[in-house]
């Protein structure tokens, strides 16, 4: 994230058609998931089209750095200058958004903030912005009310996500902003399952859709 960040090269949101795409849905990893990078993960799907899919893991904290430290590392805020954080929570959570392009930053945020030609509205009042301007706005107290910053993203080639769902890799359901922006990372997986009426203790490897 040492350079300005953008959405270049990511799948576009699909236009309306007879095909069902999962923009704005949560993917919930099934126990059969073999890839440890995605085990028990909850992923917010930002874009899904015939060209592939892109999403952000929302229950994996980065851990090694907090948001104020990052702002100072990027010289967005000088040492000693106060930072005005969003109303919802004491700080913006930094997530490990996925294994692709982990040096890039992506901000999922509420729809009360947008940058023309840089903010992607997704669904249910959730947007994606990937420029340093939003970090500056958050630091100055003029950014979105709710936000999380993800380093990296999860990406799928054309047809790959559909195949993984068909082979019982993922459940999916409409996103809940309280899960996406929630501060307690440990309970997001169970909360997402509860949203579709599934008890974690009884979850089988059979396929299912919400």
UniProtKB/Swiss-Prot annotation:
User: What are its GO cellular component terms?
Assistant: cytosol
Q: Which domain of life is it from?
A: Bacteria
Q: Give any Pfam family that matches.
A: DUF179
For this chain, the family text in UniProt reads:
Belongs to the UPF0301 (AlgH) family.
Name this protein carries in UniProt: UPF0301 protein OCAR_7326/OCA5_c07920
Tell me the organism: Afipia carboxidovorans (strain ATCC 49405 / DSM 1227 / KCTC 32145 / OM5)
